[in-house]
Each structure stands twice: as C-alpha cells, then as structure tokens.
C-alpha cells in the first residue's frame, strides 16, 4: 500500500504569518513557518516547514519561484531585510541580516551565510560552508571573492526596502 506523504509526513502545525506580511495567492507556505513583519513571499514560491521550522525575518523578501525547505535537524533561519532572488533555493541553512541571495543560487544544509553578504546569481553554497559577514561570494562551489564596501552594503539595504514597498503594493491589490 502506498503511503500518503502529505498526510503522514507534513506537520499539522500551521504557519504563523504577520498581518503586515504579503504572501502571493499562488505561493505555498506550509507547516512550521514563521513570517516576520513586512516580509513577503512572491509568486510561485514554496516554503515548506515539514521536518524543521522555517523562520523568515522582518522585511525579508522571498522572490518568485524560490524554494525554502528544511531537513531533519536543519531548520532555515533567514534574518531581517534579506533579499532572496528569483528561483533561489534555501535548504536547511542560516542567512544573516541584510544579505542578498542572488537569482538561482542554492544554499545547502548547515551552510551559514553571514550578515551584509552578497551571494552571486547561480552560486552553490555547499553543505556546512561558512560565508563570513560582509562577503561577496560566488561560483560553484561558492567562494569568498572580496569584502563588500559600505556602498555595496547600502545597496543591499535598499534592495530590501524596495521589495518591502513592492510587497505592500501587491498586498493592497490582492486584498481588493
């Protein structure tokens, strides 16, 4: 007899979503997921907290078609004012505040990406890798290439603020 994954494995815990967060109509947020104030989950993204919790910090945006998933003993913790670019995958990892994960990047179990970091588009941050605060990292496997200067860090902050504004516009439209 075939087992039903959704009824046997997925938790009965419901997501905790801030009233100021935006979740697109066709995004999936399921299980032990917490979305902070002014956070956003854009179109087609999937956040599935079935084996461990997912915590998305205030002001963080999870863009179109991202996948955020966990593994046993590997929760996902994403800090505040983080931008997770289109199609990125976060799996059982930690991402610090004010960081940008580029489009199509993959961050694997146990990886730790610091605050004020830029992970380049298409990068692969391997299992248990550590990217220090203030780093530019890219490639497959991702390697730290340089430290970010204050201007680059300010751009990371602005990206998060821009997406907070866009999310609030989408939320208002969706609630009409």
Would you name each region that the model predicts?
Residues 4-41:
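N-terminal segments that cap or nucleate solenoid repeat domains
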Residues 2-16, 50, 56-58, 64-66, ...:
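Glycine-rich hexapeptide-repeat left-handed beta-helix
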């Amino acid at each position: 007899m075939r087992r039903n994954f959704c009824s046997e494995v997925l938790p009965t815990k419901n997501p905790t979503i801030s009233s100021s967060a935006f979740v697109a109509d066709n995004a999936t947020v399921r299980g032990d997921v917490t979305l902070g104030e002014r956070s956003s989950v854009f179109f087609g993204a999937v956040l599935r907290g079935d084996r461990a919790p997912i915590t998305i910090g205030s002001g963080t945006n999870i863009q179109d078609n991202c996948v955020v998933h966990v593994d046993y003993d590997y929760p996902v913790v994403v800090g505040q004012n983080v931008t997770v670019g289109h199609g990125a995958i976060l799996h059982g990892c930690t991402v610090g505040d004010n960081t940008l994960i580029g489009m199509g990047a993959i961050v694997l179990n146990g990886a730790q990406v610091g605050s004020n970091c830029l992970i380049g588009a298409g990068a692969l941050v391997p299992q248990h890798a550590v990217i220090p605060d203030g780093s530019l990292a890219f490639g497959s496997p991702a390697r730290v290439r340089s430290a970010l200067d204050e201007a680059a860090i300010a751009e990371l902050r602005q990206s998060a603020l821009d997406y907070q504004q866009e999310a609030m516009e989408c939320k208002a439209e969706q609630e009409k």
